[in-house]
Amino acid sequence: MSPWISPATLKPEIELLVRRWKLPHDRVAEVERLLAAQSEGGTACALLPITPTHAAAWGSACQPLPLTPSDVTLAPSPLVLRHHAGQPHLQAWRFYSAEQTIASDVLARAQRAAPPLARPISALLADLGPDQVNAQQTKAITCALEHTLALIVGGPGTGKTHTLARLLALLIADHPEKPPVIHLAAPTGKAADRMKEAVEAAADHLPATLPEKTKTALKTVAASASTLHRLLGFNPSTGQCRANATQKLRSDVVIVDECSMIDTLLWQALLAALEPNTRLVLVGDPHQLESVAAGDVLGSLVRFARSHPGTALDRVWLELTESQRFRHRPGIGALAAAVVNCHADAAVRLLASHAAPSDNTAPADGLAWLGDHGGRFAWEHLPVTVQAALIAVADAPTPAEALTALAGVRLLTAHREHTLGAAGLNDAIQRHLTQRPGIKRPPNQPIIVNHNDPETRLTNGSIGIIMDVAGNRAAYFPPASADAPPRKVPLGQLPDTSAAWALTIHRSQGSEFDQVVVILPPDDSPLATRELIYTAITRARQCVYVWGGEATVRAALGEQAVRCTLLAASLETLTPAPSPAP
């Protein structure tokens, strides 16, 4: 459930409607479905089966007036009735308001020039030297230097982080005596950690034409990467942010990664907290799964920009398409392309031609199909290379070695509770590793943190390892910097965690692993979608094993996750027609 919505607000809203409007039972049920769906995630409006007569009745009852938990008894209506594409849409006020403000702010930023630079952009780009960025990346950097909004999207390995590192280096080098205040953020702790690691690594490969102090400053910026909640100062007890519309975040540049994971209300909070002249660079992959909570903001922005050439939003979005990650693993890249384009026949043919190697080696082009094994999991069904990687995690002698090994392998599944869900897979793997003959100590156990914890400064999605060191069993997490030892957290201080040999695909977003076993859901699962499979297979750096049947692949590629959102309608209303070419 989104932290921006309190479950306690649902009951008063429904009671208000019943009391004020004397709603019949069928419409009470509609409202319950709408409010529950929006609080649990998924949709930012509802396409309810409203007849013209009912639409007129709703129209007289729904008024676009603000509603908050504190004034629920005073507001005439928590709902808004909107007509779009010939269909009545019933929408909760909070999402109507959020989408309106997001559309307005995004379009204003797209049209606003960024604060002036000390040097011409051409001179800054020349500092990078030759062959540092391709044409697409150069265009993305130029856009971010010119505007207060840049939307940079692309699949894995297309150079998003490479581009960001060079953009940041140029911004720092432009004001060497007083570098800009820069914040890096991502929706989850794991995504923020990945962002930090990637930018730090990119800083080591900046061209020699840039001053050494620029590289040092960039590493300092990378080390400060945080979750969006931490950046905004979100207080879970009040549902409010320290940085907001009246108390802005002091920042010259804000870069947000993994934007597909951000829900509507968090987008609204982010935009409200920024000064008009703050450079905002939004980065993500619109083909991935949407946010767990309500909304599909990144996807809506990209689709609108793509379908409205010449508009302000079209001028500030850039897609990077030249992927390097799968150049030596073409099987993964080919499957990802087939999935994105919903080419079920091509995906099935590709998998059928990639049976798991019989010689217990990793597949040469990074892809293997394991079949579905009758829908039942057994350790023996895992490829030998995956078994060896899991054992390396379990038996690593030091926390540093265990964490390094853990980054190399993961099982990903659609469900948490299911025959092949994360909970059952974790139990089965831990049981096998514990019952091996001849082991001398309990196996190390990977864990994932389930919520932000200010006391330990562990964030939702942080991955660690529980293990014995010198007879003392504790949890260890990746260090804050590459040259520091792993962070030790006593078991008594750990927040709520779950085992992490296997993760749900949703929880894996923002992560990468050398080897990934993707366990597909049954073909009749509502989670079997194109976005789910794409997100899972693109978590792999070197090798992906697909566990599942042909029927699931075909069912998933016939289903695209569609969020009911009216953000595009709000953008349409507020966007002026593009000027004709001279």
Locate each region found by the language model:
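C-terminal accessory regions
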Residues: 449, 462-578, 582
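Intrinsically disordered, low-complexity N-terminal extensions of AAA+/P-loop NTPases
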Residues: 1-58
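Interdomain "pre-motor" coupling segment immediately N-terminal to P-loop NTPase/helicase cores
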Residues: 53-119
